[in-house]
C-alpha cells in the first residue's frame, strides 16, 4: 500500500481537487496492480504539468476531503 500512496501523492499534486478525490475513491475500488497502472499512466500524462500549490492533495488530505463530502451528503439527504 505504501507504493500506491507515494505514487498517488506524486500524481495528485498536479490535479484539481475533484479529480484527486475521484482517483482516491477509484484506488480503493480497484485491485492493487490496476490502481498502480492507473496512477503510473496519470503520472506520465501529467509529467510536464506544474504542481498546484493552492491546497494539499496527498492521500491523507483526500481521505479527509472524501470524509467531509460523505458527511455533507448524508446530512443533506437525511
Curated annotation (Swiss-Prot):
Organism: Feline immunodeficiency virus (isolate Petaluma) (FIV)
General function of this protein: Seems to function as a Vpr-like protein, since it mediates host cell cycle arrest in G2 phase. Cell cycle arrest creates a favorable environment for maximizing viral expression and production.
Motif (Nuclear export signal): 35-43
Localization annotation: Virion; Host nucleus
Residue window of motif Nuclear localization signal: 45-54
Annotated keywords: Host nucleus, Virion
A single GO cellular-component term on record: host cell nucleus
Name used for this protein in its record: Probable Vpr-like protein
Amino acid at each position: 500500500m505504501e507504493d500506491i500512496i507515494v505514487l498517488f501523492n506524486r500524481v495528485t499534486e498536479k490535479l484539481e481537487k475533484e479529480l484527486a478525490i475521484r482517483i482516491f475513491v477509484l484506488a480503493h475500488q480497484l485491485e492493487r496492480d490496476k490502481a498502480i497502472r492507473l496512477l503510473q499512466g496519470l503520472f506520465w500524462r501529467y509529467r510536464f504539468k506544474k504542481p498546484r500549490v493552492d491546497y494539499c492533495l496527498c492521500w491523507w488530505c483526500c481521505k479527509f476531503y472524501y470524509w467531509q463530502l460523505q458527511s455533507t451528503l448524508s446530512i443533506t439527504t437525511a
